[in-house]
C-alpha cells in the first residue's frame, strides 16, 4: 500500500490566484484547516472561508512591508517536522504539523520584463518566504504535500476523495519534483537578471556586458522522449521553454501521424521559421534542415505546386510548411503526389484532415497563427561550452537596399531578389538561391566554396528544366572573388543580391557590370552553420 498522509492543515500563500478560491473551498469542505497570508488570506475571508492569518497563528506580526511573514519556527517547524520523530519537540514548542503548502512566487519575470523596471522594483519582487516554504515542504515530502501549480488543484482533490482525505507518497514525491523545478527556475531568472549587470569580458576589452549574464541559467521542460536522436545509437528528448510567446514547433499540436522523431522536429522548425518570413500565401519544403523548394502565390495550393517543382527529388520524404490554413485541395495534392514526413500549418480544415487521415503515418501539426516574431536566444553546443547569440530576425526593407551596379534592377528583378534573400537566410552556408517569379528555381547549400554553391544551384535548375535566364540570385554572405558572379552569368542570372563587404567588392561589382547584371547590397549577412 502507498504511504498515505492525511491533509488536515494547509498553508496557502499565492501570487497567482487563479483557481485558489475553488481549491480552498474544496479543502475546507473536506475538513482541512486553512492558514494564509496577506492578500490570499483577505481574498479567502471575503469569500466566507474560515481562514487563520499567519500572523495570528504565530503571534508575530507581519513586518517590514511584508518582507517578513512566514519566516517563523511555528511555520517552518510545522512544515519540516518529521512525523513520528519530531513529535515531542513540536509539542513542547506548541508547533502543529502543516500537511500541505500551496505557494507560487512573486512575479519576478513579469516585473523585470516591464519597460522601465528599476533595480529597486526588481529587488522588491524577489520572493524570500515563498521559496523557503516551498523548499522546506519539498524536502519533507515524506510527510508534506507542496503545491506550486494551479493545474494540480483538481487532481489533488480527486486523490484526496479517493483516499479518505490523504495523498500518496508517489504524489507527494511528484509534487516535490515540481517544487524544486519551480524554485530552481525562479532563482535562475534572478541570477540571470543580476548577472546581466556585470561587465562583459571581451579579451582585454572593458565594454559593457549587453544582456548576456555572467552565468547563464537555462530552464526547459521535457515535452517528450524521442525513440532516438539524430542517429539510432543516440538517446534524445525534446525540451521546450515555458510560456512560449510565438507559434512554433514547440507549441504545435500533433493532430495525426506517428510520433515525431528528433530529425522531424529539427526539420519542421527550419521549415516553419522560413515560411514565417512571408506575408503572402507561402509554402516551404525542407530536407535535412535546408529548404529545397519555396514559393509564394495567391493560394497555398499554387505555392505548394511551385515549391515542389524546384526539386521534386529532394522533396520526397520532406517537411512541408505553410503560413495559411491547410485546405482539402492542398492536402489532396500533397498526398497524391509525394511521400511526406510532416505537414505543419497554422490550422487545418476538417476536410483536409479527412484526406490526410488516409495516410496515417503522415504527421500533421497545427501551430496557430503568429502575429509577430519574438526576440530570443539561439544556442549552439560546443565541446565544453555553449555559444549564445540573438535570434537572427534581421531583414532589410526595399528602402535599405543599395544598388551598386551600373544597371538598375527591374521591378520584377527586385521582387525576385527580395524573395530569394529571405530564403537564403535559412539555407546552410555557403548559401546560394536562384529565384524567378516568386519561386526558387535552384538552391546550392552547405558548400565549402561559394562558387560551387552557385554552380550547384544552376545544375539543379537545369536538372528540373527550370529557366534560369532573367532570374535573381541571393548569397548569404559576400562574394570573395568574381567567380561566383561569372558562374551566375553563365546560366543567365540577371540580378544578384548579397551583403557586400569584401575587400574585392570592386572586382565583384565590375564583373556584374561586365555581364550586365544588376547588383544589390544589403549590408547584412545571414551565415547559417
Curated annotation (Swiss-Prot):
Q: Copy the pathway line from the protein's UniProt record.
A: Purine metabolism; IMP biosynthesis via de novo pathway; 5-formamido-1-(5-phospho-D-ribosyl)imidazole-4-carboxamide from 5-amino-1-(5-phospho-D-ribosyl)imidazole-4-carboxamide (10-formyl THF route): step 1/1; Purine metabolism; IMP biosynthesis via de novo pathway; IMP from 5-formamido-1-(5-phospho-D-ribosyl)imidazole-4-carboxamide: step 1/1
Record key words, sorted: Hydrolase, Multifunctional enzyme, Purine biosynthesis, Transferase
Q: Which GO terms describe its molecular function?
A: IMP cyclohydrolase activity; phosphoribosylaminoimidazolecarboxamide formyltransferase activity
Q: Which Gene3D superfamilies match?
A: 3.40.140.20, Methylglyoxal synthase-like domain
GO CC, sorted alphabetically, is:
cytosol
Q: Which domain of life is it from?
A: Bacteria
Entry's free-text remark on domains: The IMP cyclohydrolase activity resides in the N-terminal region.
This one is known as Bifunctional purine biosynthesis protein PurH
Pfam families to which the protein is assigned, alphabetical:
AICARFT_IMPCHas, MGS
Q: Which GO terms describe its biological process?
A: 'de novo' IMP biosynthetic process
- EC number(s) for this protein? 2.1.2.3, 3.5.4.10
Coiled coil: which residue ranges? none
- Family to which this protein belongs: Belongs to the PurH family.
Reaction catalysed by this enzyme = (6R)-10-formyltetrahydrofolate + 5-amino-1-(5-phospho-beta-D-ribosyl)imidazole-4-carboxamide = 5-formamido-1-(5-phospho-D-ribosyl)imidazole-4-carboxamide + (6S)-5,6,7,8-tetrahydrofolate; IMP + H2O = 5-formamido-1-(5-phospho-D-ribosyl)imidazole-4-carboxamide
Classification via SMART domains: AICARFT_IMPCHas, MGS
Q: Where is the MGS-like domain?
A: 1-148
Q: Which CDD domains match?
A: IMPCH (cd01421)
Amino acid at each position: 500500500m502507498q504511504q498515505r498522509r492525511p491533509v488536515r492543515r494547509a498553508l496557502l500563500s499565492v501570487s497567482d490566484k487563479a483557481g485558489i478560491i475553488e481549491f480552498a473551498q474544496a479543502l475546507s469542505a473536506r475538513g482541512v484547516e486553512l492558514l494564509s497570508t496577506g492578500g490570499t488570506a483577505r481574498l479567502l475571508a471575503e469569500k466566507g472561508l474560515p481562514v487563520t492569518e499567519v500572523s495570528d497563528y504565530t503571534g508575530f506580526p507581519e513586518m517590514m512591508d511584508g518582507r517578513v511573514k512566514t519566516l517563523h519556527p511555528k511555520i517552518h517547524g510545522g512544515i519540516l517536522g518529521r512525523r513520528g520523530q519530531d513529535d515531542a519537540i513540536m509539542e513542547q514548542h506548541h508547533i502543529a504539523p502543516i500537511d500541505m503548502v500551496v505557494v507560487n512566487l512573486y512575479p519576478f519575470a513579469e516585473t523585470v520584463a516591464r519597460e522601465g523596471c528599476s533595480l529597486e522594483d526588481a529587488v522588491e519582487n524577489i520572493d524570500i518566504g515563498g521559496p523557503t516554504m516551498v523548499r522546506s515542504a519539498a524536502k519533507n515530502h515524506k510527510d508534506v504535500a507542496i503545491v506550486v501549480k494551479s493545474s494540480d488543484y483538481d487532481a489533488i482533490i480527486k486523490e484526496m476523495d479517493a483516499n479518505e482525505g490523504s495523498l500518496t507518497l508517489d504524489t507527494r514525491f511528484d509534487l516535490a519534483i515540481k517544487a524544486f523545478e519551480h524554485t530552481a527556475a525562479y532563482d535562475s531568472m534572478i541570477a540571470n537578471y543580476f548577472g546581466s549587470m556585470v561587465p562583459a569580458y571581451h579579451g582585454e576589452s572593458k565594454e559593457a556586458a549587453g544582456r548576456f549574464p555572467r552565468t547563464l541559467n537555462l530552464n526547459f521542460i521535457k515535452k517528450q522522449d524521442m525513440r532516438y536522436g539524430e542517429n539510432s545509437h543516440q538517446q534524445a528528448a525534446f525540451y521546450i521553454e515555458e510560456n512560449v510567446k510565438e507559434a512554433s514547433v514547440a507549441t504545435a499540436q500533433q493532430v495525426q501521424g506517428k510520433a515525431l522523431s528528433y530529425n522531424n522536429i529539427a526539420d519542421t522548425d527550419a521549415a516553419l521559421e522560413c515560411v514565417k518570413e512571408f506575408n503572402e500565401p507561402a509554402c516551404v519544403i525542407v530536407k535535412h534542415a535546408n529548404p529545397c523548394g519555396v514559393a509564394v502565390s495567391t493560394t497555398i495550393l499554387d505555392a505548394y505546386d511551385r515549391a515542389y517543382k524546384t526539386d521534386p527529388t529532394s522533396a520526397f520524404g520532406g517537411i512541408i510548411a505553410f503560413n495559411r490554413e491547410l485546405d482539402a485541395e492542398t492536402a489532396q495534392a500533397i498526398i497524391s503526389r509525394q511521400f511526406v514526413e510532416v505537414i505543419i500549418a497554422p490550422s487545418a480544415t476538417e476536410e483536409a484532415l479527412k484526406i490526410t487521415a488516409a495516410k496515417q503515418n503522415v504527421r500533421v501539426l497545427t501551430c496557430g497563427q503568429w502575429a509577430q516574431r519574438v526576440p530570443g536566444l539561439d544556442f549552439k553546443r560546443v565541446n565544453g561550452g555553449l555559444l549564445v547569440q540573438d535570434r537572427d530576425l534581421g531583414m532589410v526593407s526595399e528602402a535599405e537596399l543599395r544598388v551598386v551596379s551600373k544597371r538598375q534592377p527591374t521591378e520584377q528583378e527586385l521582387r525576385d531578389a527580395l524573395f530569394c534573400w529571405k530564403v537564403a537566410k535559412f539555407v546552410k552556408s555557403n548559401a546560394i538561391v536562384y529565384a524567378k517569379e516568386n519561386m526558387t528555381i535552384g538552391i546550392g547549400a552547405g558548400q565549402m566554396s561559394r562558387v560551387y554553391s552557385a554552380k550547384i544551384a544552376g545544375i539543379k535548375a537545369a536538372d528540373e528544366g527550370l529557366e534560369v535566364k532573367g532570374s535573381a540570385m541571393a548569397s548569404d554572405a559576400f562574394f570573395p572573388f568574381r567567380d561566383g558572379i561569372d558562374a551566375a552569368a553563365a546560366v543567365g542570372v540577371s540580378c544578384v543580391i548579397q551583403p557586400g563587404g569584401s575587400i574585392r567588392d570592386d572586382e565583384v561589382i565590375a564583373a556584374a557590370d561586365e555581364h550586365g547584371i544588376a547588383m544589390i547590397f544589403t549590408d547584412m549577412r545571414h551565415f547559417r552553420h
